[in-house]
Amino acid sequence: MTFDASGRLPEAFLTPGGSSFMDFLAGHAPDLLPGRRSLGTGDLSKDVPHGTTIVAATFDGGVVMAGDRRATMGNIIAQRDIEKVFPADEYSCVGIAGSAGLAIEMVRLFQVELEHYEKLEGTTLSLDGKANRLSALIRGNLAMAMQGLAVVPLFAGYDHDISGGRIFSYDPTGGRYEEQAFHSVGSGSLFARGSLKKLYRESMSAAECVTATIQALYDAADDDSATGGPDMARRIFPVIGVVTADGYQRMPEAEVGEIVDSVVGARLQRPDGPAAPLS
């Protein structure tokens, strides 16, 4: 879509429509939607970088999301410092696993979708509404998912109705599922969830929740080669997002580094991590 000969916006921009940016693209530029692009045949999953492990956990007053920094392409480390946790809007965040390029593009479209709705309606979507919009985006990528290019995000945010955090997971068909307390997606998710089962407490503070998610990513990296643990030589640490009633905040690198140093120092004494009490 370009300006016409007189320098005016095309008619598409001047025609009244709904509050969905995705519907606008579908009607006027469907080729810009990821799911509308045609691909060849065959499994392409080993030919593109993949993001790996994302974890999220709620605490009293909000939710924490953490993502490792490794992207893999088959048995190759494609990138050591990729970022996989992003703000969706002021009160929510999204973490990506699966085909990295498609996932990042989907996150950008999701961010625009939420901003577009807010500008037209003068209010934000409810957290359930945001989760449903992301579900529709994932469903639109089903054709690519069938060829190995799946995008499986994790969505979390602060819900003002309950004054607390909520977590939503998805399957490649766009199915949406609300998770309780904590969840993880990606290749190391089984190990991360197992770790959080032992470490999670409903009474945890935000700082304790951050430490638990870093411990979970460490455990995932310990058993899953596609998940990157803290890179102490390069000082590359997980991306941590915290969402509370004050909005989304990315934890500063220096603060994450201090927690990582503490976790790694303790692992030198106990490599398998902290022991959970038996009662």
Curated annotation (Swiss-Prot):
This is Proteasome subunit beta. CDD domains: proteasome_protease_HslV. Component of the proteasome core, a large protease complex with broad specificity involved in protein degradation. Residues 1-51 form a propeptide. The active site is at T52. It is found in: Cytoplasm. The formation of the proteasomal ATPase ARC-20S proteasome complex, likely via the docking of the C-termini of ARC into the intersubunit pockets in the alpha-rings, may trigger opening of the gate for substrate entry. Interconversion between the open-gate and close-gate conformations leads to a dynamic regulation of the 20S proteasome proteolysis activity. Signal peptide: none annotated. GO terms for cellular component: cytoplasm; proteasome core complex, beta-subunit complex. It comes from the Bacteria. The 20S proteasome core is composed of 14 alpha and 14 beta subunits that assemble into four stacked heptameric rings, resulting in a barrel-shaped structure. The two inner rings, each composed of seven catalytic beta subunits, are sandwiched by two outer rings, each composed of seven alpha subunits. The catalytic chamber with the active sites is on the inside of the barrel. Has a gated structure, the ends of the cylinder being occluded by the N-termini of the alpha-subunits. Is capped by the proteasome-associated ATPase, ARC. GO terms for biological process: modification-dependent protein catabolic process; proteasomal protein catabolic process. Its EC number is 3.4.25.1. It catalyses: Cleavage of peptide bonds with very broad specificity. It is an enzyme of class 3 (hydrolase). Pathway: Protein degradation; proteasomal Pup-dependent pathway. Belongs to the peptidase T1B family. Keywords: Autocatalytic cleavage, Cytoplasm, Hydrolase, Protease, Proteasome, Threonine protease, Zymogen. The gene is prcB. GO terms for molecular function: threonine-type endopeptidase activity. It comes from Kribbella flavida (strain DSM 17836 / JCM 10339 / NBRC 14399). SUPFAM superfamilies: N-terminal nucleophile aminohydrolases (Ntn hydrolases) (SSF56235).
